[in-house]
Amino acid sequence: MVGVTPQSGKPRTLAEKVWDDHVVRTAAEGEPDLLFIDLHLLHEVTSPQAFDGLRMAGRRVRRTDLTLATEDHNTPTGYADPSFNTRRGELLTIADTVSRTQIETLRKNCAEFGVEIRPLGDVNQGIVHVIGPQLGLTQPGMTIVCGDSHTATHGASGALAFGIGTSEVEHVLATQTLPQSKPKTMAVTVVGELRPGVSAKDLILTLITQTGTGGGNGHIVEYRGEAIRKLSMEGRMTICNMSIEWGAKAGMIAPDETTFDYLSGRKHARRGADWDAAVAYWKTLATDEGAEYDTEIILDASKISPFITWGTNPGQGAALDGVVPDPQDFLDEVERGAAERALAYMGLTPGTPFRDVPVDVVFVGSCTNGRLEDLRAAADVIRGRKVADGVRMMIVPGSYQVREQAEAEGLDKIFIDAGAEWRFAGCSMCLGMNPDTLSPGQRAASTSNRNFEGRQGKGGRTHLVSPQVAAATAVVGKLAAPADL
């Protein structure tokens, strides 16, 4: 029977359906299930030790056809970097020894074990969580893992996707399975509609601030409701991408016509009768009426406004219309202490209007907001305007293909004319593992997903924002929304 477990007939959630369909072996009570993994994504940072483990044990990669690697974390993205040929963006050499070694090691491991890789210069190279959906590899009802915290991005398609550790990467490479204890489930129902000028990034930052960075607490979260249904696939990916930032195991959105339209015709999407059969199955994945979640949260989209973070974790945020909070206003002693430390690091004074906070750098990119729709949103704001004096604006497409599509639409010219840097694909300034970093004391408005101390460079100060707020901030030179222009 479609939509219920054969054993009990109990209504099931989206997460439970996908989980149940992938259980290879159910162990004794209290022991983890063994799940089959449909897609395993790799990058250069968390895979070297896993391949070493295979080599030492004399094992092979069990399903190379379900495994894909790309180079993203350590890759330089700028024309000025000697690593690039400015004509094609090919990797020639990387100055940093560790970064160079990790990329060279990934290439050698993929060649030795027969794993497909998308290296720099490849038309399908890019951030791992951008190229998966882009290629049509990410599909509803799949289980997807990667040695990366933001694997939940793929849940926007109705897949069960989550990050794993290096030892688990080795286990999946060797067996195409993974022992997992079944997490609790949570529903986040977003009622109403987002107002004009308010984005998916504002929504997820608001949710994280309201619930705290532990609000998801290991749950598989299903995002639902009118506001979620009206989001594009790119917006849904932004939501699911940041699930880990409030403690969730994974984030999922049930597939619908928006999902099918996005996936149709992509390189790895099915064709003809196979496509029709797949869509028929995907339509059964929606949560059954009467299914129960362990926890439920309701959020009113109409009350959300442009949002930013002021502290050193994604849960320390506020509406842009507000002011820097006073730690003394926090009733909880732990939160009060965390706020004091965060403001000291960020160099902010309580009571300062956020719109009076100047920035040095604006970064548009990452697996959170580096897709074509994100670049379009930023371009719409900055079109015909100029980046403020003293501000550096970096536009980093999430993939080579996104870059080409943006150039075909003339977005690169809009950014360049405004005084921004138009760069190659990569994780870039999201994290300080490549040449794109902040200097100590520099302040950035960033469309990435983490604002931890030193995340974008030692001593760097990060405010998480949407692409629209990022572009407006670049023009004003201070934190700003498009309505301020």
UniProtKB/Swiss-Prot annotation:
Residues 439-451 have a biased composition (Polar residues). The keyword Repeat does not apply. It comes from the Bacteria. Its cofactor is [4Fe-4S] cluster. Its EC number is 4.2.1.33. Keywords: 4Fe-4S, Amino-acid biosynthesis, Branched-chain amino acid biosynthesis, Iron, Iron-sulfur, Leucine biosynthesis, Lyase, Metal-binding. Pathway: Amino-acid biosynthesis; L-leucine biosynthesis; L-leucine from 3-methyl-2-oxobutanoate: step 2/4. InterPro entries: 3-IsopropMal_deHydase_lsu, Acnase/IPM_dHydase_lsu_aba_1/3, Acoase/IPM_deHydtase_lsu_aba, Aconitase_4Fe-4S_BS, Aconitase_4Fe-4S_dom, IPM_dehydratase_rel_enz, IPMI_cat. Binds 1 [4Fe-4S] cluster per subunit. It holds the Pfam family Aconitase. GO terms for molecular function: 3-isopropylmalate dehydratase activity; 4 iron, 4 sulfur cluster binding; metal ion binding. Belongs to the aconitase/IPM isomerase family. LeuC type 1 subfamily. HAMAP family: LeuC_type1. Heterodimer of LeuC and LeuD. This is 3-isopropylmalate dehydratase large subunit.
